[in-house]
Amino acid sequence: MWWFQQGLSFLPSALVIWTSAAFIFSYITAVTLHHIDPALPYISDTGTVAPEKCLFGAMLNIAAVLCIATIYVRYKQVHALSPEENVIIKLNKAGLVLGILSCLGLSIVANFQKTTLFAAHVSGAVLTFGMGSLYMFVQTILSYQMQPKIHGKQVFWIRLLLVIWCGVSALSMLTCSSVLHSGNFGTDLEQKLHWNPEDKGYVLHMITTAAEWSMSFSFFGFFLTYIRDFQKISLRVEANLHGLTLYDTAPCPINNERTRLLSRDI
């Protein structure tokens, strides 16, 4: 059996691979059509102009669904491992909410381009990166709370390093972006897709975009740490029928059907 066939480990793998493919394909398309500069564009710039924005939006919507599935499995796993720990239960619920909000933001970013609805796009980015960063932080605390009984210290330290990486990237991005859009480097910068080294604010722009890509990579790394954990879990779905037919008849007791939510043989 291959490693991705064990439990639900294919979920975080598929999430990272699919999201990376969304970025790569839209980037290649945008650069080939000269819609953006090859050197470190904003991630969302790779999906601003047609036809790449169609590809970007469709693929990131699927990525958001994969992300919700991954976050839900993680929630169920932690709940099953620590059903009576009040602190862990509260943190686990908070992580679920934060994760879902981050996925919602990802879908908003994918479907509202910055050149058309800038406010909606920025709101989606704040949800994606802001709530996503908090989700990583909460999951790292959970990893600390669950060691050494549930898992070893190595997982906690890896996730902590990824959270620090994410935090440094976020701070760099927010600082440089705030200065860049302060009004001292021109107006309507959100509409600008091409930057030249002689442009005012070029260095700040490059630092901001580099930090954004770096932050995304920290997200990828964090979800990849779920692979080993997800090898040890599977979910089932139960169908409860209230009658032998679908007509409006009185309910009668029958055997319920139980099958795996996701098969090991996928």
Curated annotation (Swiss-Prot):
> Could you tell me the membrane topology recorded for this protein?
Multi-pass membrane protein
Q: Which InterPro entries does the UniProt entry name for this protein?
A: DRAM/TMEM150_Autophagy_Mod (IPR050911), Frag1/DRAM/Sfk1 (IPR019402)
Localisation? Lysosome membrane; Photoreceptor inner segment; Apical cell membrane
Answer yes or no on keyword Transmembrane helix.
Answer: yes
Q: Does the keyword Protein biosynthesis apply?
A: no
Its predominant location is membrane
User: Which tissues does it occur in?
Assistant: Expression is down-regulated in ovarian tumors (at protein level). Widely expressed with highest levels in placenta and heart. Expressed in the retina. Not detected in brain or thymus.
Transmembrane stretches, start-end = 8-28, 53-73, 88-108, 118-138, 160-180, 207-227
GO biological process terms, semicolon-separated: apoptotic process; autophagy; cell population proliferation; photoreceptor cell maintenance; regulation of autophagy; retina development in camera-type eye; visual perception
Q: Give the GO cellular component terms, alphabetically.
A: apical plasma membrane; cytoplasm; Golgi apparatus; intracellular membrane-bounded organelle; lysosomal membrane; lysosome; photoreceptor inner segment
What induces it, per record?
Not induced by p53/TP53 or TP73/p73.
This protein's source sits in the domain of life called Eukaryota
One family from Pfam that matches here is: Frag1
Per UniProt, which keywords does this protein have? Apoptosis, Autophagy, Cell membrane, Cone-rod dystrophy, Disease variant, Lysosome, Membrane, Transmembrane, Transmembrane helix
- Disease per record: Cone-rod dystrophy 21: A form of cone-rod dystrophy, an inherited retinal dystrophy characterized by retinal pigment deposits visible on fundus examination, predominantly in the macular region, and initial loss of cone photoreceptors followed by rod degeneration. This leads to decreased visual acuity and sensitivity in the central visual field, followed by loss of peripheral vision. Severe loss of vision occurs earlier than in retinitis pigmentosa, due to cone photoreceptors degenerating at a higher rate than rod photoreceptors.
PANTHER family (alphabetical): DNA DAMAGE-REGULATED AUTOPHAGY MODULATOR PROTEIN 2, FASTING-INDUCIBLE INTEGRAL MEMBRANE PROTEIN TM6P1-RELATED
Query: What is the similarity comment for this entry?
Result: Belongs to the DRAM/TMEM150 family.
Q: What does this protein do?
A: Plays a role in the initiation of autophagy. In the retina, might be involved in the process of photoreceptor cells renewal and recycling to preserve visual function. Induces apoptotic cell death when coexpressed with DRAM1.
Name under which the protein is recorded: DNA damage-regulated autophagy modulator protein 2
